[in-house]
Amino acid sequence: MQNGPFHLPAQSKIAHAHLNVRNLDKSLTFYVVLIGLKEAYQYKNTAALSATGETPYHLILSQPKNAAAVNQRAAGLFHTAIRFPTRKALAQVITRLLRYRWPLQGASDHGVSEAIYLPDPDGNGVELYVDRPESQWPKTDGALNMVTLPLDISGLLSEAPENEEIPAAVDPGTDIGHIHLQVTGTDRAETFYHQVAGMDIMQRYEPGGVFFASGGYHHHIGANSWNSQNGPSAGDNSLGLKSFAISLPDKNAWFQLQERLIKFNYPVSKIVDYGYGLGLATADLDKIQVEFLTEKSKFSREDLAGLDGEKIKEFK
């Protein structure tokens, strides 16, 4: 392992979110027809979606048997944030949502981004956003200072005029920009995501909010305890967030994370084989399931042969 503090590589980012849903067909209608993601895989009660209809996946939906209702006080998902590459791409999706009369819950200018908030069919929070150029991000004494101001929604929607045809699919450059978690304490989130996983703390939002990122991004993970301070841990079979994955750029980072999880007593429950990548699965202090994912092509045959075969589980 390297000397000095461990930092997650700058190229790290959110790979995907995996949600438990009550009705897979209804969720597919929302995420495919209304949002515009494409189905890349389906097997029994699980479907995987992406911006292109190919791997890597951006959103995975599973319909478990006898799923428990979300405990609003428990750790879990605050929202999944779908990031669009241009204002026009975001405006087109918002226009489609308005045409379908899907309810919107909020619209904010965060300085670093323009964002719309809405629920999916199960009430899971969804953010749709586009980043501003980094040169425009607000800072105070050199430190990032995200804000929450009213969004100029009319200005944004002008990017998708009424007389223009709205494409059925999202822009292929769309991805999951960040995950915002509901946690039982931001100190617990800092212990795992900063001290163990090596993400930088970009901003604290008092009371009860903190934002983590790698590579100077405004945030890849948000964590707040506004509704869940000292609440219960995440449930194993509840609706909402089943897991999420952080993409690592190379095998060295993957093996370093494996060593750190062992060192700090975070059990690796399994290695998820997605075909295109391997996800090192563990859980944070709130039992939120997290995977560290690296492309399979980054590993040598010797690397793969040296893995614990009993822990490798094929994604289905």
Regions found by a protein language model. Give the residues of each.
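Conserved acetyl-CoA-binding loop of GNAT-fold acetyltransferases
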Residues: 34-40, 195-202, 262, 266
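An N-terminus-focused feature that recognizes amino-terminal "leader" regions
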Residues: 1-68, 74-82, 95, 223
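N-terminal beta-strand motif that seeds the catalytic metal site of vicinal oxygen chelate
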Residues: 1-25, 79-80, 135-187, 241-246, ...
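Conserved small-residue-rich
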Residues: 31, 168-213, 223
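Conserved short beta-strand elements that form part of the metal-binding/catalytic scaffold
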Residues: 38-73, 125-132, 200-238, 273, ...
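Exposed loop/turn and edge beta-strand positions of beta-sandwich/beta-sheet ligand-binding modules
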Residues: 43, 76, 112, 175, ...
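Vicinal oxygen chelate
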Residues: 11-12, 19-25, 81-124, 183-188, ...
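Active-site-adjacent scaffolding segments
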Residues: 46-111, 116-127, 136-142
